[in-house]
Amino acid sequence: MPERDSEPFSNPLAPDGHDVDDPHSFHQSKLTNEDFRKLLMTPRAAPTSAPPSKSRHHEMPREYNEDEDPAARRRKKKSYYAKLRQQEIERERELAEKYRDRAKERRDGVNKDYEETELISTTANYRAVGPTAEADKSAAEKRRQLIQESKFLGGDMEHTHLVKGLDFALLQKVRAEIASKEKEEEELMEKPQKETKKDEDPENKIEFKTRLGRNVYRMLFKSKAYERNELFLPGRMAYVVDLDDEYADTDIPTTLIRSKADCPTMEAQTTLTTNDIVISKLTQILSYLRQGTRNKKLKKKDKGKLEEKKPPEADMNIFEDIGDYVPSTTKTPRDKERERYRERERDRERDRDRDRERERERDRERERERDREREEEKKRHSYFEKPKVDDEPMDVDKGPGSTKELIKSINEKFAGSAGWEGTESLKKPEDKKQLGDFFGMSNSYAECYPATMDDMAVDSDEEVDYSKMDQGNKKGPLGRWDFDTQEEYSEYMNNKEALPKAAFQYGIKMSEGRKTRRFKETNDKAELDRQWKKISAIIEKRKKMEADGVEVKRPKY
């Protein structure tokens, strides 16, 4: 066996007298135990592709070397790494003794480095009684300085990133800490001396016979003015509530603490109230002096007359259609939807009222234009020119009810000219009282005034119904949940009728063409023209009969 693994080695030679080339003799020879041992000692031939095999471990070399034994080398390596691990554990133990887990201390609440800062930050602004201005200012300044130093210096003296002896800020901080410690030590030394010098309470030296006397003494000599808490000044603290929020009923209100400069002091409020009272009294006295005896008391009769002459004041309220505000603590979403629906309806009503007012203004303007045109037309007519009924249309906006007014006015104009007969076919029986003596006057000048019927024409007071017009609201149509029950919603959907706005501006386009709003007015106008033709024919007939000497019956009122 080779001494080293890297040295090449060969198989041992065959025994003497053994012919390997002759297979027959090999099979015929008898093998003994010695041959079997030699066969076992012969190593196996390594394949060409495999690396050379190592020597057998159980075969001992001629001279044993501990460095060449793999087991010995492994034992040495294990012991070496065990020593390194032990040294590392000892070093970590030494570091752990010097190391402080600050995160764990903060979690446990035992961090000693920031006790002073935490004490100031937690108790400076939460006192039962408000401190004085100087104490408040000094505490706030000290707290602000500690915060800035902690941010700038990166912690306390032991763990700061600044270099000792080179940073001026660190030097100032160390000096301030030394000065504060010396001051605290001096106060602690002086405190026992002051306690010893403190006298006893004078109340203990005085003997009181009654409890009333003791209470009087305490009220006179030991009463102290209570210090006010600055947070409870008038107007200092207020509640902030978001009214636009849908869940404002259940939300917790936010408290707002105003600055002391924004809050008025008690002295200023008292002075202001006193000045207001004095000024109001002086104003009242001066008004009495200016009026003198004019403002004397009236007698009962004069007082009654004065009250009768005084017109009643109109109660003008610009918000009369809105209603009173009734706050409620619990509102369901259904109530909120109902209120929104009512608000939308009120907005629509206001829009409709404005549109109606604009339409009335336009109608008045058109009426003025018609009056001016009639005046000009009247000036152009000749004095004895007869009216052309068929050629000149009349602008009458009134419906069929305007005929009664027209006949009544004609009766007043032509009273006494002729009798009343044959007009029953034109009028209803109940209209006879209104017509009166249609031809009462014989000296009628109706034919001399061709523009009389134009003067009698009046416009209709009927307004266009804009309730069905689509106002163009952006809030959209009403849905099922805007109504309380299904019946109300069904009734609304059955009666809903909305026309586009263009239908009221340009009319509705039908099969025979576009018909505007004047369509109904032209029909009334044609009906009025037909009735006027019949009345004119009756007037002519009565005139001829009266000219021929035929007696004509006159109606009685």
Curated annotation (Swiss-Prot):
Biased composition (Basic and acidic residues): 16-25, 304-313, 332-398
Region listing for Disordered, in residue ranges: 1-84, 181-205, 294-403
Keyword vocabulary terms for this entry: Acetylation, Chromosome, Cytoplasm, Cytoskeleton, Host-virus interaction, Isopeptide bond, mRNA processing, mRNA splicing, Nucleus, Phosphoprotein, Repeat, Spliceosome, Ubl conjugation
GO cellular component: chromosome; cytoplasm; nuclear speck; nucleoplasm; nucleus; spindle pole; U2-type precatalytic spliceosome
Residue list for modification Phosphothreonine: T485
Cross-linked residues, Glycyl lysine isopeptide (Lys-Gly) (interchain with G-Cter in SUMO2): K151, K310, K331, K386, K388, K404, K408, K496, K501, K509, K541, K543, K544, K553
Molecular function via GO: identical protein binding
Extent of Low complexity compositional bias: 42-53
Tissue: Ubiquitous.
Coiled coil: none
PANTHER family the UniProt entry points to: RED PROTEIN IK FACTOR CYTOKINE IK
Subunit architecture: (Microbial infection) Identified in a complex with SMU1 and influenza A virus RNA polymerase subunits PB1 and PB2. Directly interacts with SMU1 and with influenza A virus RNA polymerase subunits PB1 and PB2.
Similarity comment: Belongs to the RED family.
UniProt protein name: Protein Red
Protein source organism: Homo sapiens (Human)
